[in-house]
Amino acid sequence: MQFRLTLLLLFALQSIVTAAGQPTWKAGSATTLITPEKPLWMAGYGGRTKPAEGIVHPLWIKVLALEDANGEKGIILSSDTLGIPKTIYDNTCAALKEKFGLERRQIMLHASHTHCGPVLRGALLDIYPLDEEQTARIEKYSTKLESNIVATVSKALENLEPAKVFSGQGISRFGVNRRNNMENEVPKLRAAGKLRGPVDHSVPVLIVRDMENKLKTLVFGYACHNTTLSFYNWCG
């Protein structure tokens, strides 16, 4: 059975530029590939019985750096991981402060919450039968992830340039309240217009264009628990 999910973005975009056309923002973005090179256990399902076996989509870190007219900087980071454990968050924020002078109020570290990413140091270690080799691999990967985050932020800051920043909000209706609707009943309930429970179908959007209006970066969010895929392949 093939499902088609139509994402309808109704952009009523508001430009955050001066009336005279002078840029009030600088923006820079960067990405880093973080797909594990060796098999690791996957985070997100307690019923898994073995490490990952292959790749569907690579895993990435993606960073947007913004600077306003007063020189105040902010970092938005997305990682293809289930979450960012406190140890990694703390170490990363400390490194970003030491290297770039960034305070925590200037840093947004976000995980896509994919259930097809690796187990990380400080999270879910007690629900998988990890041997010494796997534990060591997780530690090594987590340490490298920290350095990759810092390096990607560095690249994004180096790429800062005058930019136009737009904000807007769209809508996508594929999300369903899992607590109030049985999975096997969802197609029938949707067709009848009888899906139950609160949902948030809004899609907040941030668009960055250069001064020639070329699209540079797109940031969006959606409230949906990523539990659809349960195979043993990395998938960002």
Located regions from the model:
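Conserved beta-alpha junction segments in alpha/beta enzyme cores
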Residues: Q22-H110, T114-G236
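Sec/Tat signal peptide C-region and signal peptidase I cleavage site
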Residues: I16-G21
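Positively charged n-region of N-terminal signal peptides that target proteins for export
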Residues: M1-L5
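Bacterial N-terminal signal peptides
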Residues: T6-S15
